[in-house]
Amino acid sequence: MALKSPAFRKKFPLLVTGSLLAMQPLASSFVVAAEQYDCAVSATGGWACSPKTPAAALPPRPVHDGSAVSAAGEAPAESGSTAESGPKPVLVTESKGRGLKSRSEDYSHLDWVPREKLTAAQLAETGPYCSGSYIEPIRPGMNDKTNKSDAPTFIGAKASRYQQDSQVASLAGDVVMRQGSMQVEADEANLYQAESRGELAGNVRIRDNGALIVGDHADVQLDTGEAKVDNAEYVMHKSRIRGNALYAKRAENAIIRLKDGTYTTCEPNSNAWQLKGNNITLNPATGFGTATNVTLRVKDIPVLYTPYIYFPIDDRRQSGFLPPTIGTGSDTGFMLVTPYYFNLAPNYDATLYPRYMAKRGLLMEGEFRYLTKSSEGQFGAAFLNDEETERSKQTDYQKNRYMYNWQHKGGLDSRVFTQVDYTKISDPYYFQDLQTDQIGVKSADFVNQQGSVTYRGDNYTARLNAQAYQLATVSNITPYDRLPQITFNGQLPYHPEGLNFDYETEVVRFDRDLQNGNFVNEDGTVERRLDNNVIGLARANGDRLNLKPSVSLPLNWTYGFLKPSLKYQYTQYQLDLDGTGKSQIVAQQNAAAATGTRYVGGEFGSSQNRGVPIASIDGGLYFDRNTTWFGKNYRQTLEPRLFYLYVPEKDQEDIPVFDTSEYTFNYASLFRDNRFSGSDRVGDENKLSLGIDNRWIEEDGFERQRISIGQALYFKDREVQLPGIDPKTRDDAHSNVSPYALEYEYRWNRDWRTTADYNWDPDSRSPRSGSAMLHYQPEDNPNKVVNVGYRYRNDQVRYDQNTGKWSVGGGDYGTPGQPGYVKDYYKIQQHDFSVIWPIVPQWSAISRWQYDYNRNRTLEAFGGFEYDNCCWKLRLINRYWVSYDEFSQNAPENEKGDHGVFLQIVLKGLGGLTGAKVESFLDKGIQGYRQREDQAF
């Protein structure tokens, strides 16, 4: 029957039953099934009733629990069919964390559906190693959002009776009571009008808002929805949470409280792990739970105790402790991190990371994150009073270690964009010693200290930037700061005859304070600072104005394109140089004259300028045809390309290098109009580059194969070089041809991909550089990951911090015959193999091996296994790696091998117990690992 609640509903919603049965003759103390009626509220506010179809004979009325007394003070009626005469129910405490099979062999009483019975949509939401899922059956009202005070009450049963003198209604046989989204089911029920209370017995189920409570007996407060269920089991379907309790209480606000209860995300037939506590509270409104006097049990064996725990029951944020991290390290000793999360508001939060290190003391780290309609960012800070004294003799060491950081991205309006990335650390050894990246600042050779404002106009972009760096190492020289940098770039809004007019403008101040004097190593040895190796013109600071207008005529057709272009780059410098640099220039000039060699260091002039025209013509054709390969249809393309570039030689030796380096040669280099990055060098060129692309494209647009090959023909030598490089002694500066540049990609299918690049020098008849990479990760099963790679490079153009000059080739570290010399230190010849592969269901092997052939050493190697099921995951990995600990300025001496065994345990639905370090090196070392984890269930 469906009834709209009358005004007296709050007192007793199920007075419907009493009103119905009270119309029967007073002499009859009960009404049998044959005398039942269906009633509804009439238009006049009364009851409109009609005879109900006869039902089966009414079973004996359930016995009223002796602990409960009706309003009339009536003692419970006696019955020959008592609970004692039947089999004793199995208690949840006897299940050892599993579901009660006595209620159903297949755990269907918990809405458990085996994997083979799930629909395709349900399987997509179920983990690959899960044997099933909790699926709430479709029922009337399950998604009803009506306020309960306004919702009608529905009652159903096979038979009912009403005792007028005690105001007790009895229902039997598939009893169902529903109001709004809440539904109560039982075999039998007694409803006590005076107390607005109901007693339910036999297969009790209470459903509401995606939660299910099952028990043997329940007391329900009919006007509020409060309930107490004895010998209870519960399920929260979406979160895959289940457990049991001596009894469970459901509050009016749907909060569930468990006495002597358990909590787990394991399947009903598993007790792999569970929380067991005296009092457990689950709050669906906040998405979090709490428990007191808690033991974490693994296979019913207690492994951890805590007097209190706060844990998530869904994906919502909430203040509380996060899973701790436990580990050891040679620099920290035993380490324990106990993060606490503050959910301050929907758009900002904070996290505190107390980090105890046995060797160093307590490091306090914290971060504050914010998000607004137009910006996002975070503040971070850390402090440690370091108890370790191993670096006490070392230059720049600070006992009070600290770091603070601000990262920000935002817009003042639709055109103005702001950005801040500022980090300050106490000393250059901070990241090496403390091994921390909790607050989003990654360890590097430098930390950035930058702020910028960008304005985007309709046809231009203006930017004001201030950028400095702080060294986070002692084995590099001090970099230049840009304080400030102003850029103004854009395109004129009109295009006469199809011409494009573009411009680039920059004004910037480059400045740095070189550290002179000596450096004291960890063992007390005194060395000269590396900044002393910066000599001559390289010590200059200065202002730079760079203007680069251009005009081009892009022509495009279906069969090809042509783009002639003319640029002019003008650069003006105002320089200052200290006395040391000036005297070094004179000394170098005298030394070159004495030996009869050419001086290539440049001369100092406070005002320098350079203007260089850049002319180019870029053109290409497009051919395609339909073809068949191995029975599959393709569109094959042939795309030849020609690029002519002319840049006259302009002497630039007297201009220092502030932000310029030389690009590494590859296929893309053939079509660049400057072989240098930055604005301090414009390379002289007279070349013609020829390239060709060949692609195989399937009918659905999938590119199966692509190959690109090209070479440049030079009509003059390249005289413009970086400081310290003599074009007369650089072989490739006077070659007539460039290396052959090759790029290749083949997709075996949508999962397997092979990429390669190769640069062959025809003059030396040897490779200059190359790499090959095979990557496999199925789209439908990202748990499988295979990476095989090899790379070789011996053509780097780099700055040598030990000599203060630029050099070409792989290069040695130091001087032959001197301490610390390492041959071919900068040459790269490495292989990298990594794999994550399921061996048997739930078990995967994890491995990586990175080897340096040039120095005959392993850079990193680890191997281990992962066990993953529906409710927990374990990784055990043995790892060797080359760590970097700066006790001197000699970089190779700071490299040392290290070894560790790492354990990671994740209890799904609760968090990781330990092993945050494992996540870090797997993410960095295995391509595809992050995609695998992001798509994991």
From Swiss-Prot:
Its Gene Ontology cellular component terms are: cell outer membrane; transporter complex
Enumerate the Gene3D superfamilies for this protein.
Answer: Lipopolysaccharide (LPS) transport protein A like domain (2.60.450.10)
- Please provide the record's keywords in A-Z order: Cell outer membrane, Membrane, Signal
Where does it live in the cell? Cell outer membrane
Does the keyword Signal belong to this entry?
A: yes
List the InterPro entries hit by this protein, alphabetically: LipoPS_assembly_LptD, LptD, LptD_C, OstA-like_N
Q: According to the UniProt record, where is the region Disordered?
A: 58-104
What GO biological process terms does the UniProt entry carry, in alphabetical order? Answer: Gram-negative-bacterium-type cell outer membrane assembly; lipopolysaccharide transport
Sequence ranges of Low complexity compositional bias: 66-86
Pfam families noted in UniProt:
LptD, LptD_N
Q: Where is the signal peptide?
A: 1-33
Q: What does this protein do?
A: Together with LptE, is involved in the assembly of lipopolysaccharide (LPS) at the surface of the outer membrane.
Subunit composition and interactions:
Component of the lipopolysaccharide transport and assembly complex. Interacts with LptE and LptA.
State the family it belongs to.
Belongs to the LptD family.
Stated name of the protein = LPS-assembly protein LptD
Q: What is the lineage of its organism?
A: Bacteria, Pseudomonadati, Pseudomonadota, Gammaproteobacteria, Pseudomonadales
